[in-house]
A protein has these predicted regions:
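Catalytic cysteine-centered active loop of the rhodanese-like fold, especially the PTP/DSP P-loop
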Residues: 148-207
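Active-site neighborhoods of enzymes that stabilize oxyanions during catalysis
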Residues: 213-220
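Bacterial N-terminal signal peptides
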Residues: 9-19
Length: 220
C-alpha cells in the first residue's frame, strides 16, 4: 500500500512538473485583427497568396530587422507625417489595399520602393517593385523613363507639357521601415512632379513592422 501511494505521488509530481511545459507548447491562435480576421487572400505575380501571421507563439523577430542602431545618415528616423496630405497607414490598412487591388480594383497600386538587393530578402505579397532610384534624376533616372512610369504604371497623362492626375492611381508605398528613406524619396519625387498628395499613402512601418508582426512575405 505504501509503495502504491509513493508511486501515485511520484506520478502527480511528474504531471505537475510537465504541465506548464505542455501548456507552453500548445500554441494559441494568432489572428491579424481583434475580432477574428485570421487571413487575407491576395494576388502576387498571378498566384494567390494567403497573408497570415506566424502561428508559433515562440517565434522571434527576423535577424534582418533586429538592429537598433544603423548609422544616421542615411538610416534616420522618419516622421509620422511625411508631407501635408499624404496619409500614413498601418498594417490593417495595407492589407485592405492589397485585398482591394487583388479583387480587381486597378485604381490602387502597392509599391515596394526598395532597391532589388533589399527586395531579394522578402517583400509584401501583392506589391510591385519600383526602386526609389527610378524616379530620382540625381540617381540617373531620365525624364523619358520617368514619364513612361507615370503614364504606364500610375495612370497619369501629359497635356501641353503638364501632368494631369484625374485618372491617376492611389499609390501605397513602403520600404524597410521607420528608419528607411527609400519610400520617402519616391513620395517626395512624386510630389515634386505634382502627383496629388491625397492619392499617396505611406506605410511607415514597412518591412520591419510587417516582419516583426509575423506577417507573410514572399521572395521574387
Amino acid at each position: 500500500m505504501g509503495i502504491q501511494k509513493t508511486f501515485a505521488g511520484a506520478l502527480v509530481a511528474v504531471a505537475m512538473t510537465i504541465a506548464p511545459f505542455a501548456a507552453h507548447a500548445e500554441n494559441k491562435p494568432v489572428d491579424i485583427t481583434f475580432g477574428g480576421k485570421a487571413t487575407a487572400q491576395v494576388k502576387h505575380n498571378g498566384k494567390i497568396i494567403t497573408i497570415q501571421r506566424v502561428q508559433d507563439n515562440g517565434n522571434n523577430v527576423d535577424a534582418s530587422f533586429a538592429k537598433t542602431s544603423r548609422p544616421c545618415p542615411p538610416f534616420c528616423i522618419q516622421p509620422i507625417s511625411l508631407a501635408p496630405g499624404v496619409e500614413t497607414i498601418g498594417e490593417n490598412e495595407m492589407i485592405d489595399y492589397l485585398e482591394q487591388m487583388s479583387a480587381g480594383d486597378d485604381s490602387i497600386l502597392v509599391i515596394d520602393s526598395r532597391t532589388p538587393n533589399w527586395v531579394a530578402r522578402g517583400q509584401i505579397p501583392g506589391a510591385v517593385n519600383l526602386p526609389w532610384t527610378k524616379l530620382n534624376t540625381a540617381k540617373g533616372a531620365d525624364p523619358l523613363s520617368i514619364g513612361e512610369i507615370m503614364e504606364g504604371e500610375f495612370g497619369a497623362n501629359q497635356f501641353d507639357g503638364l501632368w494631369k492626375f484625374a485618372k491617376a492611381k492611389t499609390l501605397v508605398m513602403y520600404c524597410n521601415g521607420m528608419w528607411c528613406g527609400q519610400s520617402p524619396a519616391n513620395i517626395k519625387a512624386l510630389l515634386d512632379f505634382g502627383y496629388p498628395a491625397h492619392k499617396i499613402k505611406w506605410y511607415r512601418g514597412g518591412m520591419q513592422n510587417w516582419s516583426n508582426l509575423g506577417l507573410t512575405t514572399v521572395k521574387p
